[in-house]
Amino acid sequence: MAIQLAPVQRPRMIRAMRFSSKTVGLASAVITVLIWTGFIVIARASASRGLLPLDIAFARVLGASAVLLPWAWWLMRPARQAGQQVGSLWGLSPLPLRPTVQTGVLGGFLYAILAYTGFFYAPASHASVLMPGSLPLWTTLLAWLFLREKVSAVRAVGLGFIVLGDVLVGGASLLMAFDGGEVWKGDLLFMAAGLCWASYSVMVRRHGFDAVRATMAITAFAFVCFVPLFIVLVG
């Protein structure tokens, strides 16, 4: 059942600020690049200091849960007070159970484990190219397959350059594999992580989920399923 939320009243100063869609888009792109860069650098540094992929993922889940789970609980409070059955996972996720599991597996568990494991084999420079660089490729292919989106000629040329860049970065590591190198393993893991995130993005777009609620669902799934598993396995 869809939840009708009252519009949030923004402060007067914020309402008075007017930005063009281009400005908002450019600012969002810059912030996204900074977040991706920070994620890659911190993950690589954590891997080089002896933390296992499960350890890094555990820290990621705890940090996100501390912020998003109380927010999700507050977000669904009006519906609960109205006697509506909302969300799943004991009120931690704002989405129904099935999409919560789907988003949690693709955008949460698999993505994190594949990406963090890749840092144990390949340098951060490879991750910065292969993970965010492959996202447009995977997303376009999945959107064409499941959403029936058309691929223009200009877009196809751009995707071709992405493939060329991935080959230039990952091809050298494949050649080094004959000499016992293991960088190629990390490269493949980075590409697989990008595929998981692209699958999550296309699924969210296909079902029209709100980005904030989808992120909350990822966190709720990881908190309920991954944290107990980590405690049992690692202690």
Language model features: what each stretch is:
Residues 3-59, 175-206, 221-228:
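Glycine-/small-residue-enriched transmembrane alpha-helix faces in small-molecule transporters
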Residues 25-30, 96-104, 151-163, 209-220:
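Cytoplasmic-side transmembrane-helix entry/capping segments in multi-pass membrane proteins
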Residues 28, 34-35, 63, 106-110, ...:
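Hydrophobic residues within membrane-embedded alpha-helical segments of Major Facilitator Superfamily
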Residues 35-40, 73-80, 86-131, 140, ...:
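Specific transmembrane alpha-helical segments of multi-pass solute transporters/efflux pumps
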Residues 55-66, 115-150, 193:
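Specific alpha-helical transmembrane segments that line the substrate/conduction pathway
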Residues 68, 154-173, 219, 223-226:
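Hydrophobic transmembrane alpha-helices of multi-pass small-molecule transport proteins
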Residues 111-116, 167-179, 223-235:
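Hydrophobic alpha-helical transmembrane segments in multi-pass integral membrane proteins
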Residues 131, 148-168, 180-186:
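Loop-to-transmembrane alpha-helix entry segments
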